[in-house]
Amino acid sequence: KHEMLKVVNFLDTILPKDKPRYLMGVGTPADLIENILNGVDMFDCVIPTRNARNSQLFNYDGKLNIRNSKYKDDFTPIDTNGFSVSSEIYSKAYLHHLFKTNEVLGLRIATEHNLKFYIHLMNQVKIQIKNDNFEKWAKEFLERYNNE
């Protein structure tokens, strides 16, 4: 990861600023933010859906593996940031149960959650860039996200 960031940072110095920049196969929330800081405009990755199918959910505080036994009796919502109705309706315990029993609904809820989180995250990026606040916001996001 460190090498990739070094290469992208170097490419930022030599690629034209007025052309779109595409980075393929990079897709954790932290990777997206770090690479946007380095001038990348577009991404293409399966991480939100693949990780959802493997019981991993993303949120602003990092990621959580919903199969983990600590969620068995956790009746708090999956997320409360308001970007997904299903994330506020379903509890972590319920989603944990769905994954443990191999119920397909669990995959669907987790996938919807991750995709809506990514959409919300990228909308926040756009807002922060428009407000000329992206670097500060990105630093705060990365500190919070990587501090899981």
List each model region and its residues.
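C-terminal extensions of enzymes
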Residues: 79-148
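Glycine-rich phosphate/ribose-binding loops and adjacent secondary-structure elements
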Residues: 1-78
